[in-house]
Every structure is written in structure tokens, then in C-alpha cells.
Amino acid sequence: MNTFSFNNKALYAESVAVTDLMVEYGSPLYIYSHAQIVSNWKKFDQAFGDHPHLICYAVKANSNLGVLNVLAKLGSGFDIVSIGELERVIAAGGQPGRCVFSGVSKTETEIQRALELGIYCFNVESAAELDRVESVAKLMSTKAPISIRVNPDV
């Protein structure tokens, strides 16, 4: 599927002329295709067949609320690197329980908030980070769901 095309030398996004969008919204502007996002996500999802999986969109790639909302409605998970990104996912209709918290600079406050909201798991990248997550979880009398991120080139 290609939702961007030319018709009589005019560029179209789905069935709308890009020049019409420029008149209405000004230029420059970003144009996203709902149909293309849905098509791409579904192809990726279907490639896993019956294997259990969670597709996590990297919010740092594009945190546009409209894009996040489309993905949330599809049941997507999200890869976040800050509480701000988690709050954007929630504002867009995403579920904290489908969010993986990555990144090496998680603060104790962020860890606590993520645990309160019930994230899917923390991607832990160092022993010091594991200690920090464990410490916060103990103070909250809970267990922190984790996965260990390994980079063999380091």
C-alpha cells in the first residue's frame, strides 16, 4: 500500500491533494497517513502469526498524539524513555501495561511513577540501574517487572 501518490503531477496523501492541505494548514507541515500507519502495523503484527508478542513503538521516534492514538487503538505497545513519554502515551489512549521503559537515565521518581501506573517492564541496562529499580520497588513493597538489555559489543 502506498497512500502517497501523484495524480496529474499533483501529490496526494490518501485522496487529499497536498496543496489543499497547505492552503488549509500552511507550510511547512507534517502529513501522516492513517491508512499507511494501520497497514504497516498490521503487516508487522501478522508476521508473528500465532506467536505471543508485543509490538512496542519507539515513542522517541515520533511522539505526535495522533500517531500514538492510532497505534494505541491497534493494541500497540510502546517503548518509552521518560515519564513524559509515558504521559503522552496515556493521553493518546495507550495503556501503561503495554509500555516498556528503556533508557539508561531513569530517576527514582520516574521508576516509582512507572510502577504506580503499572508498566509492562523496565529494560535494565546496568547493575547500577537494576539496584535503583530494586530499591524503589522495595520501598513500595512491590516487585518490578524487568527485562535485561544486553549489548555484546560493549
Predicted regions and their residues:
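A charged N-terminal "starter" segment
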Residues: M1-P145
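Flexible glycine-/small-residue-enriched beta->alpha junction loops
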Residues: P145-V154
